[in-house]
């Protein structure tokens, strides 16, 4: 590899040397005798950050291992809440976690950057130079040696190469994209209110491609927030007449990966909210001002959101000769080790993990599976340090919950009374839905900080607009 002969630092500086093209981030001087085990985690999503936090608390704090988290973003945000950022019903500044501060509080190292290469023989990860918003280089290309590598880079939406998708549709993969959609939505309403002429038919129409959990939750959330937005003085707009939401799904029902009863309940509620649901409708092209279906029908839209399909990042398919599947996920064993390297693990959406007990099935890419895998990885790494056998991970499916804005939450809990599925909705379902995020917060911050932050949010919420206006 081109970087194999990069100079090796021996002065203990963890940030590398900007005077060379590629530097090695070294946590100990040359010679491995008695050196601490080096754990490198790539990706600071739900699973990656929970793992780094827990390993830092258990190993880094006691100086039993060096724990490093590599992530290109500066702050962490729980991805299942992105639809609320897009709708404007949640302020990201209140809910995001700063990686640098988190690493300081929990005894791991955060290094900003994006992984671009892997040398399995030398056990080194290469991270590209980090460039800021102004195009200025902040850090050079660097290399990070590891003894245990955990890939937790998450997933992206999959546009399946659909023409126009990248150019004209907004995908909700990051908080920045969700905020971009929200700004465009607010601007569209202000523009419509201020224009001299009457609103054009379907001027404020939003097309959401993909009726999985993200698409369905976004549609329900937008129904409420757009009406709240109009109530703030944009009275030329009639939300019932001028604003339309269209949900487009290629499968024969919405929420196709979830139980039919949940899909039926969500369909009925969306109908009450005047959301137009188009199933068995495949998108052939995204246009500057709408969507063309495979049937030839054109659906006009001022804004198009792509929320269909899931794949792991493209760089994984050529990464160090590791085995991947057709959507770029790293294929792993029940121990969460990759099939071709026992020192490399993968968790979360980027891992194709067998579902033990379900022949031929894979664990679905959900927040609950990433949370469970992070907890299991803590045990696996501690076993590695003790030279003990690794245990297979068994996924526990606790069910599915879908939030339909302020109107309802519907879902099913697995293993209910008598070992059967338990259908839930209403207030109890909403409490269960909120508890999913609270579990993530507790894993990152602990009980007292979560309790105080929650109380502060409740107080602040009473003095702020219910919809973000910028």
Protein language model regions, located:
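Beta1-alpha1 glycine-rich phosphate/pyrophosphate-binding loop at the start
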Residues: 2-8, 16, 20-117, 213-258, ...
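C-terminal, flexible cofactor-proximal segment of oxidoreductases
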Residues: 2-4, 23, 34, 379-470
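FAD-binding core/adjacent interface of flavoenzyme oxidoreductases
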Residues: 2-16, 20-36, 108-207, 305
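An active-site-proximal "capping" alpha-helix that borders the catalytic cofactor pocket
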Residues: 67, 366-385, 401
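Short glycine-rich anion-binding loops that position phosphate/pyrophosphate groups of nucleotides
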Residues: 47, 154-157, 219, 310-312, ...
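A Rossmann-like FAD-binding core segment of flavoenzymes
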Residues: 15, 64, 106, 110-129, ...
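FAD-site-proximal beta/loop scaffold in flavoenzymes
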Residues: 21-27, 167-196, 289-292, 298-303, ...
